[in-house]
Regions:
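Histidine-centered beta-alpha loop that forms part of the nucleotide-sugar donor binding/catalytic region
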Residues: 1, 24, 34, 50-54, ...
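Conserved PLP phosphate-binding loop immediately N-terminal to the Schiff-base lysine helix
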Residues: 1-22, 29, 154
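Short, hinge-like loop/turn segments at secondary-structure boundaries
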Residues: 11-15, 38, 165-168
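Acidic, glycine-centered active-site loop in nucleotide-sugar glycosyltransferases
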Residues: 15, 34, 126
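Residue-level recognition of the GNAT/N-acetyltransferase active site
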Residues: 24-26, 187
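Glycine-rich phosphate-binding loop of ATP-grasp-fold ATP-dependent ligases
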Residues: 28, 32-37
Length: 191
């Protein structure tokens, strides 16, 4: 969801040992179905990733790892190739919509996304923070404006991570964010 984002002059996906991108249809660069990409400059990591995505096979019928079927279908690649040509235009439209939101919401008492001088936000989501989230949702809904709650449960409280033994109250900032974050509509065609 950070396709085209930058931090101190470096693009997302080029920092660290590996980068990961989702091509879920709702993302800034979305396929027609499921898909994703891993980036790396490390040849050994790239070799391992290629094997893991193809049932662990180094070459056909020669499986050296326990892998999965994570190959991107050709039609998905074709869709992405066409959409990639438009990504920068769509990103700038999202950034313009975010500026409009900033202008309209400044002074409203809600927390706004921050755009630092040394980074480039691509606004997959435009999320505000407010302790009055339900009131905002109701007011927006009354105007036929959709809003959404992304990630309503902090990771440490998800059943999948119960074995780690974390309890409510141990990560108060994450818990507060889960209760306050509200996503406003964000897409390139937003007017």
């Amino acid at each position: 969801q950070a396709h085209g984002a930058e931090y101190k002059g470096r693009r997302a996906g080029s920092m660290g040992d590996m980068g990961c991108f989702s091509f879920y249809p709702g993302k800034n660069l979305g396929a027609a179905g499921e898909g994703g990409m891993v980036t790396t400059a490390n040849p050994e990591f790239a070799r391992t990733i290629r094997m893991l995505r193809d049932w662990g096979a180094e070459k056909k019928y020669h499986h050296v790892l326990k892998g999965y079927n994570f190959r991107l279908e050709g039609i998905q690649g074709a869709v992405l190739r066409v959409k990639l040509r438009h990504l920068e235009k769509w990103t700038e439209a999202r950034r313009a919509a975010a500026k409009r939101y900033d202008h309209l919401l400044i002074g409203s008492g809600v927390g706004l996304p921050k755009q630092m001088d040394y980074s480039r936000h691509v606004y997959h989501i435009y999320a505000i923070r407010t302790p009055h989230r339900q009131a905002w949702m109701d007011a927006l809904g009354a105007q036929d404006i959709q809003s959404g709650i992304h990630y309503p449960i902090p990771v440490h409280l998800l059943p999948a991570f119960a074995d780690l033994g974390y309890q409510a109250g141990q990560f108060p900032h994450a818990e507060r964010a889960a209760n306050e974050v509200l996503s406003l509509p964000m897409f390139p065609e937003l007017t």
